[in-house]
Curated annotation (Swiss-Prot):
Keywords recorded for this protein, A-Z: ATP-binding, Glutamine amidotransferase, GMP biosynthesis, Ligase, Nucleotide-binding, Purine biosynthesis
Pfam family, one: GATase
Keyword Cell wall biogenesis/degradation: no
Protein name from the UniProt record: GMP synthase [glutamine-hydrolyzing] subunit A
EC number(s) on file: 6.3.5.2
Domain of life the protein comes from: Archaea
Length: 188
């Protein structure tokens, strides 16, 4: 099962629906769910959803602080991506302009979550803030003309972040990104 931490984003149910469409068991839980309850669920992966406020991400940071107790792949979407970057020492701030549109990203490293996908994708973005500077120990996976860190991966742990929303229908190959993540979790 993959646990989806609900950070109040407008697309959280689309994440769940995409995973279910792929045949993956998934469960949306409040981001305030205690760590012990999350551990008892024995998730094989965790997704941090998007949301409106980086200061209202509940126990997502605690999961990162206690990563060795979970030891499963983590994928941060939009706000979740920013939270991961901030937690590991990256810089998050306002973008040059708010993005509520399709953006073309360039995949620099096919890596795990982009395995088998084209080098350029049109993706849906819905954000004011963005990762301005990659955290130490992370590798840049994708960028765009408007955002320097569209996707990243921890160099030694299976922790990923994407600024865009793979779950939105406008994103090309969005379901494939979730399929690749589910495969990393051993769910497919």
């Amino acid at each position: 099962m993959i646990v989806i931490m609900d950070n109040g984003g407008q697309y959280v149910h689309r994440i769940w629906r995409t995973l279910r469409y792929l045949g993956v068991e998934a469960k949306i839980i409040p981001n305030t769910t205690p760590l012990e309850e999350i551990k008892a669920m024995k998730p094989k992966g965790i997704i941090f959803s998007g949301g409106p406020d980086i200061n209202k991400t509940g126990n997502c940071s605690a999961i990162l602080e206690h990563y060795d107790e979970f030891n499963v792949p983590i994928l941060g979407i939009c706000l979740g991506h920013q939270l991961i970057a901030k937690h590991f020492g990256g810089k998050v701030g306002r973008g040059e302009k708010a993005e509520y549109s399709l953006v073309e990203i360039e995949i620099l490293d096919e890596n795990d979550i982009f395995r088998g996908l084209p080098r350029k994708l049109r993706v849906w973005e819905s954000h004011m803030d963005e990762v301005k500077e990659l955290p130490p120990g992370f590798k840049l996976l994708a960028r765009s003309e408007t955002c320097p860190v569209e996707a990243m991966k921890h160099e030694s742990l299976p922790i990923y972040g994407v600024q865009f929303h793979p779950e939105v229908a406008h994103t090309e190959h969005g379901a494939d990104i979730y399929r690749n993540f589910a495969e990393l979790c051993g769910e497919l």
